[in-house]
Amino acid sequence: MKNILGKAILLASALLFSITGTSCSNDDNATPEKEKTYDMSGFAKGADVSWLTEMEKDGVKFYNQNGKATECMKLLREEGTNSIRLRVWVNPEGGWCGKDDVIAKAWRAQQLGFRLMIDFHYSDTWADPAHQTVPAAWQGYTAEQMKQAVADHTKDVLTALKDKGVTNVEWVQVGNETRDGMLWNDAEGDDAKAVTGRVSENAANFAAYVNAGYDAVKAVYPQAKVIVHVDEGNNLGRYTWLFGELKKNGGKWDVIGMSLYPEDNNWQDLTTNCLNNIKTLSEQYNCNVIISEIGMWWGSDQAAPMMKKMVDGCKAISTCEGIF
């Protein structure tokens, strides 16, 4: 989901993962502290920093709780975050979230020990439940050409990461919030329907595009887990429909990804439903689940209790891999 408050709440969830405080001393004679070590294993406590390089270019600074300017990823690590999520666009305006930008951020994250989730949108801009726009360079493709484009793009980006020495790719999303599939062709006529990856019109195409991405991921990072990601984690029917269609058409995935964006007046019910759905879906489809996105207006006094409930609840479910 395109979160217009994304820049403002970049660190909100990370604060809930904090495991130690930070301190400083003005005593010049103080004994230097040993370099701190960080446990980056286990339950994924993640943050999406896809906007980071553009924010830095615009002069945005980040500060720790003592008011000291700190590089963003280092600050996230200090606060207990152990995983980073990065979105990939095909040919974005300005290059932000394109291949080279993703490589630069992934390399920085790996140097700090972060595990990585790479999130392919298969679009030149935001892909979400209302927008799954075919990249400009892929317009007019047949279904076979579209499938090949998915495979080539996925393999190209991941190979570039691997060639750079990035080895910490643990998860790869094939599509972003694909409630009704991806790579939509909404023109009229049979030709459009033969190409679209909209599940309600051509579920077989969606499964084929997902599988093209899945196989490309495994060709580069065999151990990486492939995520199919859907919004509204509180809505069980949305998931059983989508994954039912995907399964029926031979689609492949390793992990189910969820988004959840509750509000002040509904977060108690939505979070309870989401936690229950994690258990139901992991049992029904024999796979793990991960919260790929979660958020709430940062200024709400309900944001912290909502996040605490979800972090604690997800940790208590053995089939939930983490929360971003």
Q: Where is each model-derived feature located?
A:
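Substrate-binding cleft of secreted/luminal carbohydrate-active enzymes
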Residues: I290-F324
